[in-house]
């Protein structure tokens, strides 16, 4: 028997898993978007346009007003941020059942929502994006608490507060220039809004907002990339080993020898009702073993029809084979004397 191998199936599964892990490691964090009127990029010529690639992450942040931070506006602004398609974003309209990303309604907390650009999301409520498609993030309220529920116009029209996401594209049609990962803020969540005020706990309220810690001077430094890459590589090797072990077990089972159980053929049975089970060397008849039983399925003469025609035809179709024996006419046993 040759050495076990995982086979082509195990290699393909391992390669797909490795590619998935490498994709998670290779994604970059884009420059965060601070959502208030103090962000001058909303008034830039051509609008606020980003070119994310599949695997990247983007932070949306609502800066606090109390105490004021480096990105705070003079007065706190209340917004709901929606993810819409290209046509709706150009009209500054959200659908009746909008895809809500983040609600900015807590003046004393920094709130954050992280978007993961992925084609397939493992989360039921996760967002999915297609490469070479355009998406918009818009705010249709007017900045006041009373206008939060508006689904049309708002600051999207009056102040140009919308972000165009050109997924998988580039402004020059080539490779997209990216900043090093060390200059980007660390991603703290998987598609949930976060409070970034240090020393504060989660507060009840909107389900899109959860609290986490963040320094007043900016985002925390990212984790060590060699450590992340090493952990991802170890996970990939573990998954490859599991796939290889499974393939080896399947290969060994295929190579296993067939069962050595022996079933006698129909010719081993005698005529006249004798099943040929007698022992040799003068020994008496022995008991039949499982699989050696002959079953007579016909009558004694040619005129007698078979009393079990079905099993005569398909006797080998169910489990262990059943051997069909043509029974002869009944005979008196020889050498038997009767005492009178």
Curated annotation (Swiss-Prot):
Name the principal localization, coarsely classed. Answer: membrane
Protein's UniProt keywords contain Transmembrane: yes
Carrying Omega-N-methylarginine, the residues are: 271
Glycosylated residues are: 210
Cross-referenced Gene3D superfamilies: Cupredoxins - blue copper proteins
**Annotated region Disordered: where?**
168-225, 254-298
Modification sites for Phosphoserine: 274
Q: Which GO terms describe its biological process?
A: adult walking behavior; axon choice point recognition; axon guidance; cell-cell signaling; ephrin receptor signaling pathway; negative regulation of axonogenesis; nervous system development; T cell costimulation
Q: What is this protein called?
A: Ephrin-B3
Organism ancestry: Eukaryota, Metazoa, Chordata, Craniata, Vertebrata
